[in-house]
Amino acid sequence: MISTGKAFIHENFMLQNKTAETLYHTYAKTLPIIDYHCHVPPQEIAENRQFNNISEIWLHGDHYKWRAMRAVGVEETFITGDGDDKEKFLKWAETVPYTMGNPLYHWTHLELKRYFGIDELLSSETAEAIWSATKEQLAAPERSVQGIIKESNVKVICTTDDPSDHLEAHQQIRKEGACQAAVYPAFRPDKALVASAPSFVPYLETLGAAAEVDISSLRSLLEALEKRATFFAEEGCVLSDHGLRTLPFVDTTEKEAEAAFQKALNQETLTPQEEEKYQTYVLLFLARLYNKLGWTMQFHLGALRNNNSRMVEQVGPDSGFDSMADDRFAESLNRFLNELERTNELPKTILYTLNPIFNEVIATTIGNFQGGGIPGKIQFGSGWWFNDTKDGMEKQMTDLANNGLLSLFVGMLTDSRSFLSYTRHEYFRRILCNRIGEWVERGEWPADEKWLGKVVEDISYYNAKRYFAFPK
């Protein structure tokens, strides 16, 4: 009989040596969480939503789980369709045993353990009991959204918000003052950059209405974006974010960018080069604006999105049909950063790559632009999306350590739509401590507990606290 004699999620889960155990339990375990990039709906925090069942909090927006369910043959009715919540949960429970090796298996059981005290492995055999137990617990006041945030020891949450958003939810959260965490918006102007998209012109109307600007020229667009960024800053925003397949950079002038913008405004087809000129001009404007505002600029690079056209048409975009791109961006990235650096207008920046073959491109690029008296000014962001795995996080840490300064890394973020995903910070911290422990046990790092403990504390919490200019 195969048995370890202990629960799957136990106190030393993922900690494979004594150094790792000491570092995690002494230095990382109890630190607060700064979740500086996520996709949780701020309205649910403002309303202090109470979930009726675990499907609502687990399955209603999680494309990671949806992909796994499709892979084992679950019908779409029970994924994004009109199947009822319990049916969807039972189908997920049937799927879970097949996810071993995928972080979904670890995340699922870590969340069941931390929030519901459940040690049983989720499967079709345990599904009914786990459904009932979680449903009962989710009805308790401490399992409201704000209750979960408090229990998770979250101090800061940065949501992801369109420039046209009026941020009423953030204002309500701040006004009521009941949420333990400070909740700030983050500025994501992606819709203003895709000039070739059919949605571009309608979006300009939405943005213009929010900014009270008639957007009829490139300058009026930039005016609208600046007005909205200023408003976001007044609401506590200190980060921007851009999701781009690759980072465009071509030589361009205002006249060329204006010409491309006018073609888009007239719904004429842009050439790829015209769109790149427009995007380069707008991105440089925004980066300089972020620097003026004291923000951190984030680039999430390398997602090839919405590839299954039949399914996207059926269930909508961003529903689990994305994968890694392999577009090269080393030269354009360096040219973009250099264009800002040469006039001393480069803001603090975090670079993420979805494709890990570009890890060392980013890890070496950030070293080109450090300085300004800011420790770790340009960051290689944590393993993202398909790299949000044990191997992916270890590779990101190792590549950063090999080519830069791991000790200045600002650490983990959930990038999640679920309020149970704060356990991913625990998962990350365990992997961090284990990786450092391996280096120590092999004699590659000195067994200096005081210094190692400081490094673990800094990466887990304090580097982010110092790096981001959150309101006091």
UniProtKB/Swiss-Prot annotation:
Its EC number is 5.3.1.12. Pfam families: UxaC. One of its GO terms (molecular function) is glucuronate isomerase activity. InterPro entries: Metal_Hydrolase, Uronate_isomerase. GO terms for biological process: D-galacturonate catabolic process; D-glucuronate catabolic process. Keywords: Isomerase. Pathway: Carbohydrate metabolism; pentose and glucuronate interconversion. The keyword Isomerase applies. The keyword Isomerase applies. Disulfide bonds: none annotated. This is Uronate isomerase. The lineage of its organism: Bacteria, Bacillati, Bacillota, Bacilli, Bacillales. The gene is uxaC.
